Amino acid sequence: MFRSCLRHCRRATVRSRTCPRCSHHEIPQLQVVQRQISLSSSFPHIRRLQTSSTDTQERIPIRKQLKQEAKAIKSRKRERREQEEASRHKWELTVGVEIHAQLNTETKLFSRAPTSPSELPNTNVALFDLAFPGSQPEFQVATLLPALRAAIALNCDIQPVSRFDRKHYFYQDQPSGYQITQYYEPFARNGYLDLFRHDGIAPEDGDRVRIGIKQIQLEQDTAKSQEYPPSMQLLDFNRVSHPLIEIITMPEIHTPATAAAFVRKVQAILQSCSAVTTGMEAGGLRADINVSVRLRGDGSGTHQYSGIGGLGQRTEIKNLSSFKAVEDAIIAEKNRQIAVLESGGVVEGETRGWTIGSTETRKLRGKEGEVDYRYMPDPDIPPLLIGKDIISALSNTLPAGPDALIDMLVGQYGLAIEDAKPLVELEDGARLEYYQDVVDILRNLQQDLDSKTQAGLGRVAGNWVLHELGGLLSKAGLAWDAERVTAESLAALIDQLQRKRITGATAKKVLAMLFDGDRRPVAQLLEEENLILRPLSREEYIALASAAIELNPQMVEQIRSKNQLGKLGWFVGQMMRMGEKGRVEAQKADAILRELILGLSQ
């Protein structure tokens, strides 16, 4: 029907051109337009058609399209950064942290049941853990020792008298209907923790920030629940009454990065003093975060926390299990609260949750207060009395903390902070101990060398322990093992390198051989594999120098006539390239060149 319309001029016209039947002119564009009589009215079963020799939409090349999309994404990110920067200057973030850490103990807090995490479910359970009628709490004194070590390491004042309270709530993970804690009279108060730039604090917090610790309290852990959708949930009561400490900060943190740095450093301190055995990565440490915002410089807020007034309404984000989750959850909740306030809304006090990889927090329930939990003294547990003698004994035997170790590595071993920090943190100090063994052995091996060489041993050993040996472990996907390459073998290898008996490439090759199981002593391995450098003779130096001189006689003339001695370095470089790698010593090569070019004998 469409073609028949084209054949009859009376049924159709051609825009900007005469009909093909009436003219021989070429028509670059053909578009049939409807006349006064609608085709759709004459032929209701046929849809209106339109043709064109060009696409109605211009096609964009895929490469250009990808560039445009990337540019748009970059623009959106820039706008988001600008908005965050603007909100940072307008709004003040306030964060308080509550850290729950499982103590390093053999028994539970109020029963003699063991705390071993590797047993089958519901096997390490006492009658009191399950709240059997008639069972009574029996405080295990040994559980107090790691708690005291933690409190001393965090600069807290140990209270001579503390008491236990009941925190009432009904949930399946707490069979007694209450948790035993120390809400009113905790065993430790008024601590603090200093954070530095190398700890990862935000740039706007400067070089150092001190975070106050309101209190540290002893309390019970709860059961571990496992969900099996759609409706099954299993409970493992092995964890019930496992001793915990809860570390509660003052609301003095104002950046997400600094909050994450605080949690990270607390974990390192607790591990260094053996207060805990596992950290966040194994579920032994969890963090709850309290977040509020207010207009910067505006102290008219109606809320007060820990004696600090003028704050905004806070929300609590529960059970964060990684340092990144702490930072990301704070950012998300801060942005949510700012959006609520800027839209004229009101921030509700509530408990919220966070899912890894999410961009928003989610509401779990309304925030309970002191009245909701109905705190009351526990009538079955007597007061906890702590004498000054035990505090003094623990303080004197407490190992050095991370800050003291970093200062020691920087001051005594000459390490950069960037190398000292991972040595302290990796493998709970095992690699630091290995490093110190390597340096001690090296110093004994190199007593005959000059003091300048010995002063640099700490930096050299740090590079080999952290980067060379650490790189082999990472590449192989293996955990730290000090016996894989013994401290004696690594020290002997570094000694050979320092004495220029082997090249750096040879040292790395030998380290790989030791790493793969070669147990020969380093000296024997180098000899049998013919890896020791043989010093070049005078004749060999002269031959290399003569060959280098022939490469550029014009430069030789410039050195002689214009005394451009700096150009001797070019010839030294040529000699090192032409000679066997690592055998040409720059100082000897320079002396031979001066002798041949300038006639100087040194």
Curated annotation (Swiss-Prot):
InterPro entries: Asn/Gln-tRNA_amidoTrfase_suB/E, Asn/Gln-tRNA_Trfase_suB/E_cat, Asn/Gln_amidotransferase, Asn/Gln_tRNA_amidoTrase-B-like, GatB, GatB_Yqey_C_2, Gln-tRNA_amidoTrfase_suB_CS, Gln_synth/guanido_kin_cat_dom. One of its GO terms (biological process) is glutaminyl-tRNAGln biosynthesis via transamidation. GO terms for cellular component: glutamyl-tRNA(Gln) amidotransferase complex; mitochondrion. Keywords: ATP-binding, Ligase, Mitochondrion, Nucleotide-binding, Protein biosynthesis, Transit peptide. Its EC number is 6.3.5.-. SMART domains: GatB_Yqey. It catalyses: L-glutamyl-tRNA(Gln) + L-glutamine + ATP + H2O = L-glutaminyl-tRNA(Gln) + L-glutamate + ADP + phosphate + H(+). One of its GO terms (molecular function) is ATP binding. NCBIfam families: gatB, PRK05477.1-2. Subunit of the heterotrimeric GatCAB amidotransferase (AdT) complex, composed of A, B and C subunits. HAMAP family: GatB. This is Glutamyl-tRNA(Gln) amidotransferase subunit B, mitochondrial. It comes from Emericella nidulans (strain FGSC A4 / ATCC 38163 / CBS 112.46 / NRRL 194 / M139) (Aspergillus nidulans). The lineage of its organism: Eukaryota, Fungi, Dikarya, Ascomycota, Pezizomycotina.
